[in-house]
Amino acid sequence: MGRLLAFVVGAALVSSAWGGCVEVDSETEAVYGMTFKILCISCKRRSETTAETFTEWTFRQKGTEEFVKILRYENEVLQLEEDERFEGRVVWNGSRGTKDLQDLSIFITNVTYNHSGDYQCHVYRLLSFENYEHNTSVVKKIHLEVVDKANRDMASIVSEIMMYVLIVVLTIWLVAEMVYCYKKIAAATEAAAQENASEYLAITSESKENCTGVQVAE
């Protein structure tokens, strides 16, 4: 739950606006046979600066030493390298409709154990200013483990516990408020009844006095 919440919030912040770009770390545990998103977000320091960006992804399988290129994405074109481990499994899930890429994430479908290892998301950006251009590059590193089934991390467990604690606290608070309001209404009703009774007795007493005065006068 904690992971899902973090992912949903991060995705909303990133997709809402370029100026609201937020760099969020990728998840690092994929489930065998499932689809997994490897997150790579690289924000510009100044959102108003014009830029063109492309990316190259490299991969080092667990137990090997060298990184190999698996894809390049530039000008809205995805170029996949010939690699049977990723053939028909890689889907672009980053920015679209712009050359100014800030979300450079990918999906890996039908994950296998061969996808365990280290990934590098190389981000190359050309910044255009009024009188000059400037090239920048950054590398985002992600270590991925493939497991048989999803494991609940401590953050997820703590988040769920906190959710139930919050529900209990809110329930107790609501009951206390209802009891307080009930007592307050009951006290007000009782006070009003006593006041009405006092007024009735006062009127009755006054009427008797008036009647007695009339009889004496006669």
UniProtKB/Swiss-Prot annotation:
Domain of life of the native organism: Eukaryota
Disulphide-bridged cysteine pairs: 21-43, 40-121
InterPro entries on file: Ig-like_dom_sf, Ig-like_fold, Ig_V-set, Na_channel_b1/b3
Keyword Transport: yes
Membrane topology: Single-pass type I membrane protein
Function, in words: Regulatory subunit of multiple voltage-gated sodium (Nav) channels directly mediating the depolarization of excitable membranes. Navs, also called VGSCs (voltage-gated sodium channels) or VDSCs (voltage-dependent sodium channels), operate by switching between closed and open conformations depending on the voltage difference across the membrane. In the open conformation they allow Na(+) ions to selectively pass through the pore, along their electrochemical gradient.
Full protein name: Sodium channel regulatory subunit beta-1
Species classification: Eukaryota, Metazoa, Chordata, Craniata, Vertebrata
